[in-house]
C-alpha cells in the first residue's frame, strides 16, 4: 500500500484534491489498525505515528520489549502493507520539547489522537494547521473521562450513550467542539468481539470521512453544551456485583469487563473475583452466597446463579473457548453524523 507523495497545503484549509498529512498519537492494535489503513486507502498520508513508550525502560536487554516491537511491526504490516511509516516512541516522563523537535520536519495538517492519558499542551497542537482531533469512545458530552466504555456498561447506559465521538482537542478533557459521531445499538455490545469490531469500524468511518471534511472546511463542528455530565472514571465500587442487579446485566459485565479489570462479589472474608456464569438455578432464595471449590452460588435480582471463580486456569479456558467457538460478529450497521456542515 503506497502513500501519495507529500504536498504542501499552505495556511488554512486543505485543497479539495490535495492529500492530507496526519500525525497519529495512538497505540497500534485491532481498533486503530483499520483506521490507519482507511486513512491511507482514501489517498491521505501518515507523517508519523507516535506510539506509547514502554512502561519500564530496562537498563539491559529486554525480551518483552523486543516481543512488543515485533508485534507492532506485524500489525503495521497487516494493515499498511509495505508502506514506510515513521514510528516515534513517547512515554513517561513526557518530554514535549523533544517530541516537538522530532515532529518539526513533518509538514502535517492535523494530529489525530486516541486514548492518550494526559492533555496535550496547546503549543503542541498549534504546530498543526488544523490542530488536534481526538477519538472518544462515547457520545459526548456524556461520559467524558478515561474509562467511558467501562462506565457505560456499569451504569447500563451503553445503548443510550455508547458510540464514538470525533472532537477537537482543547484545554479541557474531552471538551472540544464535536465534529462527528457514530452511535452504537444494543447489538454492538453483545460480546467483546462485536464491540471491538464496531469500534474499529466507527474509527475508520470517522477518520476517513469526517477528518478530511474538517480539514477541507466542509465541517466546522458544534460546541459542547454546558451542564453537569458523568465523569467516566472507574472506581473499585463499580466492579462489585450487587444482588439487586439483573442476570443479563451481570452477564454483560463479565463479557466486557470480566478479564480486564474484573468483576467481584462481596462475601464474608472478602471479595471473590467472578468468572463466567455456569448456570441459573432458579428464582432468588434470599440465602447468602455460597462458595464451593472453584464456584460461587449467589442471588441476583431475577434468579440464583452459579459462576466460576476467576483464576489463571479459567482465563486460559475462556481464551481457548473463544478460539474454538468464537462469538459471531455481524457486520455493524453504523451511521456517521456530521456537525456544522458547510452549505
Residue ranges with predicted function:
Residues 33, 73, 93-100, 146:
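Structural motif corresponding to alpha-helix initiation and N-cap regions
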Residues 25-29, 92, 311:
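Structural motif
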Residues 13-15, 26-35, 40, 107-110, ...:
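Hydrophobic N-terminal alpha-helices or hydrophobic patches in metabolic proteins across all domains
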Residues 64-91, 312-313:
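Conserved nucleotide-sugar phosphate-binding/catalytic loop shared by glycosyltransferases and other
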Residues 21-22, 110, 114-229:
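Donor/substrate-binding cores of folate-linked one-carbon enzymes
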Residues 223-343:
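Internal anion-binding site segments
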Residues 48-50, 86-106, 111, 119-137:
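Internal alpha/beta domain cores that form substrate/cofactor-binding pockets in large enzymes
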Residues 2-70:
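N-terminal Rossmann-like dinucleotide-binding module
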Amino acid at each position: 500500500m503506497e502513500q501519495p507523495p507529500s504536498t504542501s497545503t499552505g495556511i488554512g484549509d486543505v485543497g479539495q484534491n490535495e492529500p492530507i498529512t496526519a500525525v497519529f498519537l495512538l497505540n497500534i492494535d485491532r481498533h486503530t489498525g483499520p483506521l490507519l489503513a482507511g486513512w491511507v486507502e482514501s489517498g491521505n498520508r501518515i507523517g508519523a505515528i507516535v506510539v506509547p513508550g514502554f512502561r519500564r525502560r530496562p537498563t539491559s536487554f529486554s525480551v518483552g520489549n523486543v516481543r512488543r516491537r515485533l508485534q507492532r511491526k506485524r500489525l503495521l504490516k497487516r494493515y499498511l502493507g509495505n508502506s514506510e511509516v515513521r514510528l516515534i516512541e513517547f512515554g513517561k516522563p513526557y518530554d514535549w520539547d523533544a517530541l516537538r523537535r522530532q515532529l518539526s520536519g513533518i509538514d502535517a495538517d492535523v494530529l489525530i489522537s486516541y486514548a492518550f492519558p494526559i492533555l496535550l499542551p496547546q503549543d503542541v497542537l498549534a504546530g498543526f494547521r488544523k490542530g488536534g482531533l481526538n477519538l472518544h469512545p462515547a457520545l459526548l458530552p456524556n461520559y467524558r473521562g478515561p474509562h467511558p466504555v467501562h462506565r457505560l456498561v456499569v451504569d447500563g447506559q451503553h445503548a443510550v450513550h455508547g458510540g464514538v465521538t470525533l472532537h477537537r482537542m482543547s484545554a479541557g478533557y474531552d471538551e472540544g467542539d464535536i465534529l462527528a459521531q457514530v452511535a452504537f445499538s444494543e447489538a454492538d455490545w453483545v460480546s467483546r468481539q462485536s464491540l471491538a469490531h464496531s469500534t474499529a469500524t466507527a474509527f475508520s468511518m470517522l477518520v476517513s470521512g469526517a477528518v478530511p471534511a474538517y480539514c477541507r472546511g466542509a465541517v466546522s463542528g458544534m460546541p459542547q453544551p454546558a451542564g453537569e455530565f458523568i465523569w467516566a472514571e472507574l472506581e473499585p465500587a463499580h466492579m462489585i456485583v450487587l444482588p439487586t442487579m439483573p442476570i443479563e446485566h451481570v452477564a454483560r459485565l463479565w463479557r466486557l469487563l470480566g478479564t480486564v479489570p474484573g468483576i467481584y462479589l462481596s462475601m464474608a472474608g472478602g471479595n471473590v473475583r467472578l468468572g463466567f456464569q455456569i448456570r441459573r438455578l432458579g428464582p432468588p432464595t434470599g440465602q447468602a452466597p455460597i462458595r464451593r471449590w472453584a464456584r460461587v452460588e449467589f442471588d441476583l435480582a431475577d434468579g440464583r446463579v452459579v459462576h466460576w471463580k476467576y483464576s489463571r486456569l479459567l482465563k486460559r479456558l475462556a481464551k481457548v473457548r473463544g478460539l474454538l467457538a468464537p462469538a459471531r460478529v455481524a457486520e455493524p450497521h453504523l451511521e456517521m453524523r456530521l456537525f456544522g456542515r458547510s452549505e
